[in-house]
Regions:
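Short, structured motif recognition centered on aromatic/hydrophobic residues
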Residues: 4-7, 22, 59-67, 77
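Generic detector of short, locally flexible boundary/turn motifs and exposed helical patches
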Residues: 26-33, 55-59, 86-90
Length: 127
């Protein structure tokens, strides 16, 4: 599958700049419309078929999900974004077997909870 970045809640200007950045790196960008927020992330990145689902809760935060990308590709993206002075997106995740079954809102909540725990100096998962 082609390396893809799923985007959520980016305004048109931010999305346009991100598309340019990703074009330089050979990455696809998929802006996920709010009506698809009910889908599992696996369906949004093309791993599974879409499901019949009730409308999902939205969220206002910007979110990026790196799909079908290894750590080196994610790091290249982050370095290039910094070099191009692309304003950071606070919430980012790499697709995993666990989060693939979540909706974007579930992932957003988890990322915000993890971020808050780190700010408090706590660990977020059992070791």
């Amino acid at each position: 599958m082609r390396p893809t970045i799923l985007t959520f809640n980016l305004n048109e200007n931010r999305l346009s700049k991100l598309r340019f950045l990703c074009m330089k790196l050979g990455l696809a960008v998929k802006a996920v419309p709010t009506e698809d927020f009910c889908q599992p992330i696996s369906a949004l990145c093309g791993m599974t078929e879409p499901v019949e689902a009730a409308p999902a809760e939205g969220f206002p935060e910007e979110l990026l999900i790196f799909c079908h990308m290894d750590n080196a590709a994610v790091n290249r993206f982050l370095q290039t974004a910094k070099q191009m002075r692309y304003a950071p997106v606070a919430l980012k995740a790499i697709l995993t077997p666990t989060n693939a079954e979540w909706t974007p809102a579930q992932l957003c909540r988890e990322l915000k909870d993890e971020r808050a725990a780190v700010m408090r100096g706590e660990t977020t998962h059992e070791e």
